[in-house]
């Protein structure tokens, strides 16, 4: 049976007068609508010629059909290309039911029929649904080729309204009006201040997270700082000299590079809210990312200002240049012993993955503290000082602390708990997604694992039956020094699906080199701020019949 598009059948009937062609060919109009088929009865041809002649005729028809189909599409595309759509109209087409539309430059495309054919799978294409393709093509440069554009042209339905391409004017009274443009793939938890995470299917695509989809945690509006006038103030030690460092001054210090994973204390908080309500953003599994950072070592800069290790306890306090309308800036601190240890790798970073820091990630300078919770990696760094006590910032003293499940907002005493520094061992499943349908036969499971304090992940265990039986996943990633494992490990497991199984309860848990392991459930580690959420990660999927 030869299946041709309905439009091709019409054109073939018009151009070739199929009823008079000798051979035996059955042509059926292709349609997802069965009611269409009776309009095109079977066309049967017979004759005494050999099968060779029949195949020649079929080849001719196929070639002619392809040409006519292309010509028919070009005609339809030309007729529809004058249609003008607003950005709002495009954004309303985000599902197979409404149609999957995307925009590239000034053109609008309906890629609904192509979604299942997308080489990266429909889920990747759906990330761009209702919006522009450019940010995703920037991540996957292989798309920006002539044959890909030719393929995309087949799905053009119109043009984007020119007014939607004009940049909006900045409202100066809005403290967030000058925030940078963000990648549309990010899953937004808060617009003001901006907080967002990459979707899980993109998070573990690369060992090094691309800058545009690195998770973003902001507490205040993003400052727009001039690199030429920027100065970093380092308060000198008693008898030492305070420093006022420009970017060029920082570049004059020895440059160090280090791969570091940053994780928000609230990563996977959404799982704690399923136990009981907590205060905080509804982070899923994406408040974690990895980058290659470069800059001056904090210990070198502090030594230049006369600081050295002392026998009494001391803390290095950081103040950012982001502030609220009252002038209150974000602040945090780490122990002086960590800051002064060259092996700890604490950086005053000015590069991220070989590029100047993006604004959302601290341009022009931020602190990077390997193995420590993201809250201490102060961005837009403006001032560094050494104090006998930790920072008096709200975010150091009254936030980012863990408590017993029995503590509520009526009984909490923030002074009774230490500030979070190192984080516990963590892992999560990024593929497949919860609720997804997987093929029978074999399932591929992917995810990440990481532990704080430089502790290396030595094993990830995966279960398909909720934890009754386990298999060991394969670990990928850079080899790291013992107790200096600052970056995550990506992991993968290909496992057979048990015959007849209709559902899978997939679970993962990681073990670090201190043999710390994740707890099995959330309830015993629940706390009112929803931090330190590291129970076994669970994904429930269905198996295709």
From Swiss-Prot:
A GO BP entry: sulfur compound metabolic process
Signal peptide: none
Cofactor(s) it depends on: heme b; Mo-molybdopterin
Pfam families: Cyt-b5, Mo-co_dimer, Oxidored_molyb
Binding site for heme b: 118, 143, 145, 147
Phosphoserine: modified positions: 123
Record-linked SUPFAM superfamilies: Cytochrome b5-like heme/steroid binding domain, E set domains, Oxidoreductase molybdopterin-binding domain
Known pathway: Energy metabolism; sulfur metabolism
EC code(s) of this entry: 1.8.3.1
Catalytic activity: sulfite + O2 + H2O = sulfate + H2O2
Any one GO cellular component localisation term in the record: mitochondrial intermembrane space
Keyword Manganese: no
Binding annotation for Mo-molybdopterin: 215-219, 264, 322, 361, 366, 377-379
Transit peptide residue numbers: 1-79
Chain ranges of the Cytochrome b5 heme-binding domain: 82-161
This protein's record includes keyword Lyase: no
PROSITE patterns noted in UniProt: CYTOCHROME_B5_2, MOLYBDOPTERIN_EUK
Cofactor binding mode and count: Binds 1 heme b (iron(II)-protoporphyrin IX) group non-covalently per subunit. Binds 1 Mo-molybdopterin (Mo-MPT) cofactor per subunit.
Function statement: Catalyzes the oxidation of sulfite to sulfate, the terminal reaction in the oxidative degradation of sulfur-containing amino acids.
Protein name per Swiss-Prot or TrEMBL: Sulfite oxidase, mitochondrial
Species name: Macaca fascicularis
Lineage of producing organism: Eukaryota, Metazoa, Chordata, Craniata, Vertebrata
């Amino acid at each position: 049976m030869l299946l041709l598009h309905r439009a091709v059948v019409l054109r073939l009937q018009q151009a070739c007068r199929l009823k008079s062609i000798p051979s035996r060919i059955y042509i059926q109009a292709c349609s997802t609508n069965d009611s269409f088929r009776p309009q095109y009865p079977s066309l049967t041809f017979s004759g005494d010629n050999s099968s060779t002649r029949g195949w020649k005729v079929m080849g001719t028809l196929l070639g002619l059909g392809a040409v006519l189909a292309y010509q028919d599409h070009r005609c339809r595309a030309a007729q529809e290309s004058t249609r003008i759509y607003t950005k709002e109209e495009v954004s309303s087409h985000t599902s197979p039911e409404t149609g999957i539309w995307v925009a590239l430059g000034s053109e609008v495309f309906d890629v609904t029929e192509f979604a299942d054919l997308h080489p990266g799978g429909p889920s990747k294409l759906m990330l761009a649904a209702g919006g522009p393709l450019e940010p995703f093509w920037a991540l996957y440069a292989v798309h920006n080729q002539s044959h890909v554009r030719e393929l995309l042209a087949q799905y053009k339905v119109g043009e984007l309204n020119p007014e939607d391409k004009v940049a909006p004017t900045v409202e100066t009274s809005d403290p967030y009006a000058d925030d940078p443009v963000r990648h549309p793939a990010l899953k937004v938890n808060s617009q003001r201040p901006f907080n967002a995470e990459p979707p899980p299917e993109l998070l573990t695509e690369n060992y090094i997270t691309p800058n545009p989809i690195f998770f973003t945690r902001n507490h205040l509006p993003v400052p727009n700082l001039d690199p030429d006038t920027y100065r970093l103030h380092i308060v000198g030690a008693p008898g030492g000299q305070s420093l006022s460092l420009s970017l060029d001054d920082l570049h004059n210090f020895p440059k160090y590079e280090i791969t570091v994973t940053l994780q928000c204390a609230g990563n996977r908080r959404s799982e704690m809210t399923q136990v009981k309500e907590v205060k905080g953003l509804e982070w899923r599994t994406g408040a974690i990312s990895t980058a290659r950072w470069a800059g001056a070592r904090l210990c070198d800069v502090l030594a230049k200002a006369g600081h050295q290790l002392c026998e009494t306890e001391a803390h290095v306090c950081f103040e950012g240049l982001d502030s609220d309308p009252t002038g209150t800036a974000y602040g945090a601190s780490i122990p002086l012993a960590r800051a002064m240890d060259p092996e700890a790798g604490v950086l005053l970073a000015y590069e991220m993955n070989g590029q100047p820091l993006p604004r959302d990630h601290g341009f022009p300078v931020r602190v990077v503290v390997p193995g420590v919770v993201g809250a201490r990696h102060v961005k837009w760094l403006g001032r560094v000082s050494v104090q006998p006590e930790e920072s008096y910032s709200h975010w150091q003293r009254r936030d980012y602390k863990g408590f017993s499940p029995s503590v509520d907002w009526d009984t909490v005493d923030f002074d009774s708990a230490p500030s979070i520094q190192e984080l516990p061992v963590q892992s999560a499943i990024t593929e497949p997604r919860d609720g997804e349908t997987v093929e029978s036969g074999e399932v591929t499971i992917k995810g990440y694992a990481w532990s704080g304090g430089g502790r290396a992940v030595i094993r990830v265990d995966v279960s398909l039956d909720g934890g009754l039986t386990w298999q060991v996943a394969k670990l990928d990633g850079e080899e790291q020094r013992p107790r200096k494992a600052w970056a995550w490990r990506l992991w993968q497991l290909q496992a057979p699906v048990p015959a007849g199984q209709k559902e899978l309860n997939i679970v993962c848990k990681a073990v670090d080199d201190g043999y710390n392991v994740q707890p099995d459930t959330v309830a015993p580690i629940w706390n009112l701020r929803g931090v330190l959420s590291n129970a076994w990660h669970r994904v429930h999927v269905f198996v295709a019949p």
